[in-house]
UniProtKB/Swiss-Prot annotation:
Biological process according to GO: defense response to Gram-positive bacterium
Glycosylation site list: N34
Bias (Basic and acidic residues) ranges: 1-13
Organism annotation: Giraffa camelopardalis (Giraffe)
Name of the molecule in the record: Ribonuclease pancreatic
Record keyword Secreted present: yes
Bridged cysteine pairs (disulfide): C26-C84, C40-C95, C58-C110, C65-C72
Keywords (A to Z) from UniProt: Disulfide bond, Endonuclease, Glycoprotein, Hydrolase, Lyase, Nuclease, Secreted
EC number assigned by the record: 4.6.1.18
Any one Gene Ontology cellular component term annotated for this protein: extracellular region
Described purpose of this protein according to its UniProt entry: Endonuclease that catalyzes the cleavage of RNA on the 3' side of pyrimidine nucleotides. Acts on single-stranded and double-stranded RNA.
Amino acid sequence: KESAAAKFERQHIDSSTSSVSSSNYCNEMMTSRNLTQDRCKPVNTFVHESLADVQAVCSQKNVACKNGQTNCYQSYSAMSITDCRETGNSKYPNCAYQTTQAEKHIIVACEGNPYVPVHYDASV
């Protein structure tokens, strides 16, 4: 079974692209990362930084998660991210996404030993 850390990496890390030029990016990535297998995942964020840089956020600014848990961490610096949001005419299995690029601080939930990101909480 896929570990929580591996799942986070599959769903949220795309170090190979520093910026997204194609409006088709989300449609391609959401499919290739298996985020549209049994339903269209409504919202997903990809982070265009190295896995090591994203894992390092677990030792940065401790903040509360949206659900009230205290194991969330905000990155000290802004990171290059792409938000994928399902469009109104998207219908499974033909999931369709809007691609929006931004530079934002990311907030992730961390757990385990080693202490690594397991959930993408927000961007600020």
